[in-house]
């Protein structure tokens, strides 16, 4: 009975967290980008030989990035231009179609390179180069520099 109560409490808290995240797109995208960055750091450390190649960690990174690509277009509704540690350029809302196309290109690069990345360190290096170009393309146009 106690276990059921604990599990029910956890379920409710997770649902509340999800609802809060959905109602605050700025916070949601900030958290998403922080998660992306954490995964990127692990992958880069592998590429530099600072930690051993680990296919499970690479898969986790690519899964995170694939999820990000799916969520990105919906995380920039009108009215979410300000708030939080918002580095989103106003150009996103002025050129939303282009922004969404860049998010789709990121998703395609992640999908196209995922198997290669998980297979070997050499594949990871090639995959990250391809995926990184799509990250840079969007960040160069649509991310403000740190204040």
Regions found by a protein language model. Name each.
Residues 1-2, 19, 86:
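N-terminal targeting/docking segments
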Residues 15, 129-132:
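Processing junctions and N-termini across compartments
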Residues 22-130, 147:
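Extracytoplasmic c-type cytochrome modules immediately beyond a signal peptide or single-pass transmembrane anchor
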């Amino acid at each position: 009975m106690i276990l059921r109560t604990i599990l029910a409490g956890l379920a409710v808290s997770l649902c509340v967290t999800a609802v809060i995240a959905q109602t605050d797109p700025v916070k949601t995208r900030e958290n998403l980008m922080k998660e992306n960055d954490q995964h990127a750091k692990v992958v880069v450390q592998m590429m530099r030989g600072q930690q051993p190649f680990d296919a499970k960690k690479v898969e986790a990174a690519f899964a995170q990035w694939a999820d990000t690509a799916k969520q990105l277009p919906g995380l920039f509704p009108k009215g979410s231009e300000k708030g939080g540690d918002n580095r989103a350029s106003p150009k996103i809302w002025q050129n939303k179609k282009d922004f969404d196309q860049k998010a789709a290109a990121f998703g395609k690069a992640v999908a196209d390179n995922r198997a290669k990345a998980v297979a070997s360190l050499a594949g990871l290096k090639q995959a990250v180069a391809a995926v990184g170009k799509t990250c840079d393309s969007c960040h160069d146009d649509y991310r403000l520099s740190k204040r």
